[in-house]
């Protein structure tokens, strides 16, 4: 990750593997990313603030807060749109609450700006 970010900031291309949000695994296919002359890179991810390197090089960091009921509804709609069964969605939601959500909530501490999302 650190090497790829440095490469982008130096104006060079990187190749990254695609991520399958349904299986939570990396695909064999890749994408090419190029930032060009820009000195801005936006890293969007639920655990981005958990990475010390990212925090150290970032001028701006944001944490998006949302009511848990709204987050659950959005989560379930997201996976329903992918034609995943309700049983699978509920299981995935439970698993994420155990292995991912605690890390995400703890990362709020590192954000320079907290944004309350109410939709």
Which residues fall in each region the model found?
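ATP-dependent small-molecule kinase phosphotransfer cores
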Residues: 1-39, 94
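A structural signal for short, well-ordered beta-strand segments and their strand-loop junctions
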Residues: 16-18, 42, 63, 116
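ATP-dependent NMP and nucleoside kinases share a basic, alpha-helical "lid"
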Residues: 26-78
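A broadly conserved detector of short glycine/acidic/proline-rich loop/turn motifs that flank catalytic sites
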Residues: 20, 47, 119
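Small-molecule kinase domains that catalyze NTP-dependent phosphoryl transfer to phosphate-bearing small molecules
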Residues: 51, 80-119
